[in-house]
């Protein structure tokens, strides 16, 4: 309500000032919106123009890039090729080009090739291979075509560049002006609507001023609602504009991608069509040249210089000039009147081309053909290449299509093509190219009648079109990108596919025309991409980014508008709705808070009083009773904590800490905590951490300790007399590659499927841990891991009774045990493993196990931890640094017949900076050379490897070599359990300097080594402990609790450290005691108290301190009046049984400095207060 009153007062006092400044304030966003819109439009326009210019430049250089990429030829090399020809050759080629018509490319190419002398061709040859297998003459045939092509790109670049600039500039200017006009209209509309809203608001203000004061709250709500409405309208328009811009960007970019794809397809298709057409025409020129050769040397000379053998040999040796042809043949023109004479000269009859069943001649034996029927003219084949030698004597005029082809060829004087037909053997479609061979006396400008009369024969060449196209296109770099089809389109009603397949995206294709030199036949090349258009991520990504930014900015502005426009009534409604939605959760939280407080508060009194009772003068029996009661109370507290943890996990309220901690220190604590129970049963407890595990990791140390404690506690509980419990920690990456494992312990554990006696810590068989690792996804996952995180694999192995097979499926179910007798025999509630598994899952890990009844169980889990910074240090371990410095560089010898146990001992020594060698027996130690035994600081012998007779030999060796040794090593015996009497007896023999009781841990080793090696030097930790005991001496501490027992427990614990304790029973009394000035140095505050709880009392105390500090700072009062303190802040720590995280957060929010949960120990109380005082 106070917030509402302040808002109403501010509105009534500044209504006129606000209304007068609204107009000026409004003009600023409108102007800013117009300016931003204009800048965005201009920026987008220039970006697009720049990209268009780059695209124009890239497209202009496209042909040059394609030529270089596919033929490895640059523009300068083409110019060099042209410059190789002499001026006369170039002039001749240009004249040929000028005289020829557009359809006569082949003819003038041949003429140019013939005009170049053979000797010049040899001297001007260029090793420039286009991948087509042509000779130098074929290169010269194309010389007349290169220069016109090279003269065009520069002009085309300039024209295309100017045209692209003009079109792009006009298009984007037009779009920009339209957007700007639209933005101005929208801004004007907003301004008009706001003017109306402002007028209405002024009228409402005048009416509200006349109303009674009781309606001020309603007026403030209405004004605020109206003031926020127009802001939401502008925000909505802005979001719509951003969405529209995102959609437009996607559409424009996608269209551009499609256009580029089409242009790429067109360029690639045109390039292939041009290559195919050019090479076909080059081959056509060679066939034409062959026809001229036949005319010159067969008909022009008497006798003829060519026969079948010569023709066959010549065509075979010059076949490299016609790599695209399947074969060539020459047919002689024979009139009917000369048929008999012709047949007598050649010794064979002219055969008919087609048989009665219309089978193609290539598929039949010529001897089986019928004689050619009587007709005016015949065209029998007299010369043929070896590949088509079977058609000799066949009349080419007897075939309908070949007859038409021959007639067109001799009438036009050009090469003509047949329609596609299937070739022999290959079953491919092919065509036949026919040239008429004329008499050498035929003039160049002969008429059609003259050409028919001068015809003396016909030269034909067959082409296998699929092989031809495949041969020409296989050298192109992007051959696999597009699919190419070649069609004969002479008959538009029925296209004939000469080459191609059905693969590819037929929805988008490009058609390029082909000119094979026959104007009466039409051919086309159809190209398409083999794959469909991929997802346009280039268009989607920026569009989504713009959309996300739009919504993010819109959300931020919307939240800001809501914060401005929200009134207390709306907040209250939201709180009510939220309270209804979370009613069940609040009830559960209240239940947990009440139960934990009601149970833990009396437990605090029970444990506190028992502890105080044990500090009194009790006899042995009374002390035993008090210790038993205290232990049972702690067990009950642990049970309560487990139940509360399970409830918090189920409700999803459990959160993990993220602080640096030393995992080895945690494992030492757990082994120290549980070593007593393990030693009572004679169980060997061992801990090993891989050297690859960092010294400090980031995570939740308390929850990690809880998991280890649960697993090890269960192992101790279910392990009978003797045996072992082995805790090992490795990086999960170490087990990914079993063949590359370097860690000695891990390698031995993976060596056998089920560990043998000699391969375990105690010698008792244990199940192999591999069974619990192999199903972990996190261990063998191939996903990349963050560089600042590590995955740890923790294994707890025991030699207990094992888990029955039928009970293994429900082992992680809460409140479930193997059978009903388990709880009666071993105790427990069955929720420890369930809690541990859920905690592991919160650590992004997995938990599993493998167990065999009668052998034991192995539990393993993984967890993700953070890597600590290199300079991170743990305060708890700093007290060991000095001791480690004393031991660094020492050498030790470990004698143990168990390899894994010896590695555990070496691991503990390595933590102290001591290097150790391992031997398996005392006999092997005796056989070691003197150099290995020299400079040893200590020898550690496991009790299982101890043999008095063998050790006497080793002791004698030390005695004889005492001169060579700088010092005699100390002897330590490592035992799982030993009474004080047994330890004294062992040391009295003089062979052993000290007996170390396992489990080995840093603190125990430091203590033993310091007492033995440094001759009883006092340990640094004890000195530090005694110094810390003076921190609370003479300190004034206030304890606030409504429970008398709790006050007495806290008072007794603090008085032991010399503190002066004052107790009060309520928050009001504490408020009076803590009102400055006062003499208290710290305060323990209970949270749940009648009249005034701890939260309210702390808030009141902080308010009083702030007021006093403010007055002292401003000089209103002097510091001498308040005990010369310039700033008052008494440390207040909460005492409560409520352990829910929400309560802890509330304590910090109200101004408390710390948190102590009940029941608490003396150490807990002392540590909580001591951190606020400087050591003396």
UniProtKB/Swiss-Prot annotation:
Disulfide bonds: none annotated. Keywords: Cytokinin signaling pathway, Developmental protein, Endoplasmic reticulum, Kinase, Membrane, Phosphoprotein, Transferase, Transmembrane, Transmembrane helix. Disruption phenotype: Hypersensitivity to ABA, and strong drought and salinity tolerance. Slightly reduced sensitivity to cytokinin. More rapid germination, reduced requirement for light, and decreased far-red light sensitivity. Reduced sensitivity to N-isobutyl decanamide. Defects in procambium proliferation and absence of secondary growth. Enhanced freezing tolerance. Impaired meristematic development in seedlings. Disturbed cytokinin-mediated flower development abnormality. The modification Phosphohistidine is found at residue 597. Induction: Rapidly induced by dehydration, slightly induced by high salinity and abscisic acid (ABA). Its EC number is 2.7.13.3. The keyword Transferase applies. It is a multi-pass membrane protein. Residues 302-526 form the CHASE domain. Pfam families: CHASE (PF03924), HATPase_c (PF02518), HisKA (PF00512), Receiver_CRE1 (PF24896), Response_reg (PF00072). Activated by cytokinins to initiate phosphorelay signaling. GO terms for biological process: cellular response to abscisic acid stimulus; cellular response to cold; cytokinin-activated signaling pathway; negative regulation of iron ion transport; phloem or xylem histogenesis; regulation of chlorophyll catabolic process; regulation of flower development; regulation of meristem development. Residues 51-174, 254-536 are extracellular. PROSITE patterns: CHASE, HIS_KIN, RESPONSE_REGULATORY. One of its GO terms (cellular component) is endoplasmic reticulum membrane. PANTHER family: HISTIDINE KINASE 2 (PTHR43719:SF35), TWO-COMPONENT HISTIDINE KINASE (PTHR43719). Self-interacts. Interacts with AHK3, AHP1, AHP2, AHP3, AHP5, ATAF2, AT2S3, BETAA-AD, CYP20-2, DRP1A, HIR1, HIR2, PI4KB1, PI4KG5 and At4g12060. This is Histidine kinase 2. It comes from Arabidopsis thaliana.
């Amino acid at each position: 309500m106070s917030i509402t009153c302040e808002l109403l007062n501010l509105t009534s006092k500044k209504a006129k000032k606000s209304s007068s400044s609204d107009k000026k304030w409004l003009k600023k966003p409108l102007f800013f919106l117009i300016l931003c819109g204009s800048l965005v439009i201009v920026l987008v326009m220039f970006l697009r123009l720049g990209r268009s210019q780059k695209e124009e430049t890239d497209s202009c250089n496209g042909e040059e890039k394609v030529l270089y990429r596919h033929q490895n030829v640059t523009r300068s090399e083409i110019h060099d090729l042209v410059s190789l020809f002499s001026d006369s050759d170039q002039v001749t080629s240009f004249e040929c080009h000028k005289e020829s018509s557009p359809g006569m490319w082949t003819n003038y190419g041949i003429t140019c090739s013939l005009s170049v002398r053979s000797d010049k061709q040899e001297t001007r040859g260029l090793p420039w291979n286009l991948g087509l297998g042509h000779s130098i003459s074929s290169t010269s045939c194309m010389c007349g075509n290169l220069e016109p092509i090279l003269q065009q790109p520069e002009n085309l670049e300039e024209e295309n560049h100017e045209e692209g600039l003009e079109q792009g500039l006009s298009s984007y200017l037009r779009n920009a002006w339209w957007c700007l006009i639209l933005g101005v209209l929208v801004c004007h509309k907003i301004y008009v609507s706001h003017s109306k809203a402002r007028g209405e608001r002024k009228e409402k203000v005048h009416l509200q001023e006349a109303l009674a004061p009781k309606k001020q709250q309603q007026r403030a709500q209405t004004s605020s609602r109206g003031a926020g409405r127009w802001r939401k309208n502008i925000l909505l328009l802005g979001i719509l504009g951003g969405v529209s811009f995102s959609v437009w960007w996607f559409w424009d970019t996608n269209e551009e991608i499609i256009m580029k794809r089409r242009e790429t397809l067109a360029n690639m298709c045109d390039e292939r069509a041009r290559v195919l057409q050019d090479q076909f025409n080059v081959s056509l020129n060679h066939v034409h040249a062959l026809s001229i050769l036949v005319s010159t040397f067969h008909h022009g000379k008497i006798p003829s210089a060519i026969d079948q053998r010569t023709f066959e040999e010549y065509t075979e040796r010059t076949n490299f000039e016609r790599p695209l042809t399947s074969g060539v043949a020459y047919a002689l023109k024979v009139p009917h009147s000369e048929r008999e004479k012709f047949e007598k000269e050649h010794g064979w009859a002219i055969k008919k081309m087609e048989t009665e069943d219309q089978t193609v001649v290539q598929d039949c034996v010529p001897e089986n053909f019928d004689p050619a029927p009587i007709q005016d003219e015949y065209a029998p084949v007299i010369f043929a290449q070896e590949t088509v030698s079977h058609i000799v004597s066949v009349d080419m005029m007897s075939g309908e299509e070949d007859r038409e082809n021959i007639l067109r060829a001799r009438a036009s004087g050009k090469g003509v093509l047949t329609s596609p037909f299937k070739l022999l053997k290959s079953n491919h479609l092919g065509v036949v190219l026919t040239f008429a061979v004329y008499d050498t006396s035929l003039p160049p400008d002969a008429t059609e009648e003259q050409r028919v009369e001068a015809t003396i024969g016909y030269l034909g060449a067959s082409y296998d079109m699929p092989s031809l196209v495949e041969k020409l296109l296989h050298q192109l770099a992007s051959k696999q990108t597009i699919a190419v089809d070649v069609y004969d389109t002479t008959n538009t009603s029925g296209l004939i596919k000469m080459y191609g397949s059905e693969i590819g995206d037929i929805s988008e294709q490009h058609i390029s025309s082909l000119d094979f030199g026959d104007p009466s036949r039409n051919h086309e090349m159809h190209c398409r991409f083999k794959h469909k258009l991929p997802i346009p991520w280039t268009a989607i990504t920026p569009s989504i980014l713009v959309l996300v930014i739009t919504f993010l900015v819109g959300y931020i502005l919307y939240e800001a508008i809501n914060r401005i426009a929200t009134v207390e009534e709306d907040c209250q409604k939201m709180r009510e709705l939220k309270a209804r939605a979370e009613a069940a959760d609040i009830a559960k939280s209240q239940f947990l808070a009440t139960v934990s407080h009601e149970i833990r508060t009396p437990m605090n009194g029970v444990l506190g009083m028992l502890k105080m009772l044990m500090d009194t003068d009790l006899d042995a029996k009374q002390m035993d009773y008090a210790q038993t009661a205290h232990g049972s109370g702690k067990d009950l507290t642990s049970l309560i904590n487990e139940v509360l943890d399970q409830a918090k996990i189920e409700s999803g309220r459990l959160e993990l800490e993220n602080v640096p901690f030393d995992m080895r220190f945690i494992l030492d604590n757990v082994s120290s905590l549980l070593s007593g129970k393990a030693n009572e049963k004679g169980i060997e407890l061992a801990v090993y951490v891989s050297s690859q595990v960092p010294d400090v990791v980031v995570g939740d140390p308390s929850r990690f300790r809880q998991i280890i404690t649960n697993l090890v506690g269960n192992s101790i509980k279910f392990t009978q007399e003797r045996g072992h419990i082995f805790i090992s920690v490795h990086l999960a990456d170490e087990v990914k590659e079993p063949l590359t494992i370097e860690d000695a312990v891990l390698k031995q554990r993976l060596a056998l499927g089920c560990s043998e006696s000699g391969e375990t810590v105690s010698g008792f068989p244990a199940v192999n841990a591999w069974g619990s690792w192999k199903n972990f996804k996190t261990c063998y996952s191939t996903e990349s891991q963050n560089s600042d995180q590590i995955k740890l694999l923790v294994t707890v192995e025991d030699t207990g009774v094992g888990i029955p097979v039928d009970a293994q499926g429900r082992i992680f179910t809460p409140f479930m045990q193997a059978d009903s007798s388990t709880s009666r025999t071993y105790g427990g509630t069955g929720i420890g493993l369930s809690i541990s598994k859920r905690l592991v899952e919160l650590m992004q890990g997995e938990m599993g196990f493998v167990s065999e009844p009668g052998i034991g169980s192995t539990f393993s889990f993984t967890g993700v931890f953070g890597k600590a910074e290199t300079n991170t240090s743990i305060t708890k371990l700093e007290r060991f640094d000095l001791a480690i410095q004393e031991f660094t560089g020492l050498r030790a010898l470990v004698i143990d017949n168990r390899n894994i146990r010896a590695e555990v001992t070496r691991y503990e020594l390595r933590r102290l900076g001591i290097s150790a060698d391992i031997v398996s027996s005392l006999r092997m130690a005796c056989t070691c050379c003197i150099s290995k035994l020299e400079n040893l600081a200590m020898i550690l012998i496991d009790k299982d490897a101890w043999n008095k007779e063998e050790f006497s030999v080793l002791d004698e060796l030390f005695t004889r070599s005492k001169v060579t040794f700088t010092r005699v090593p100390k002897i330590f015996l490592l035992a799982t359990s030993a009474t004080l009497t047994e330890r004294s007896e062992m040391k009295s023999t003089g062979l052993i300097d000290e007996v170390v009781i396992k489990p080995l841990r840093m603190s125990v080793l430091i203590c033993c080594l310091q007492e033995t090696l440094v001759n009883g030097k006092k340990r640094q930790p004890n000195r530090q402990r005694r110094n810390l005991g003076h921190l609370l001496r003479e300190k004034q501490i206030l304890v606030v609790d409504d429970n008398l027992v709790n006050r007495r427990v806290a008072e007794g614990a603090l008085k032991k450290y010399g503190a002066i304790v004052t107790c009060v029973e309520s928050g009001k009394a504490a408020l009076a005691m803590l009102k400055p000035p006062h003499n208290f140095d710290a305060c323990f505050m209970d949270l749940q108290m009648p009249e005034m709880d701890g939260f309210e009392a702390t808030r009141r105390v902080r308010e009083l301190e702030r007021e006093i500090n403010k007055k002292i700072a401003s000089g209103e009062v002097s510091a001498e009046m308040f005990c010369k303190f310039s700033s008052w802040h008494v440390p207040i720590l909460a005492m409560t049984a409520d352990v829910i995280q929400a309560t802890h957060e509330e304590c910090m929010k109200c101004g408390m400095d710390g948190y102590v949960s009940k029941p608490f120990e003396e150490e807990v109380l002392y540590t909580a207060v001591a951190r606020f005082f400087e050591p003396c």
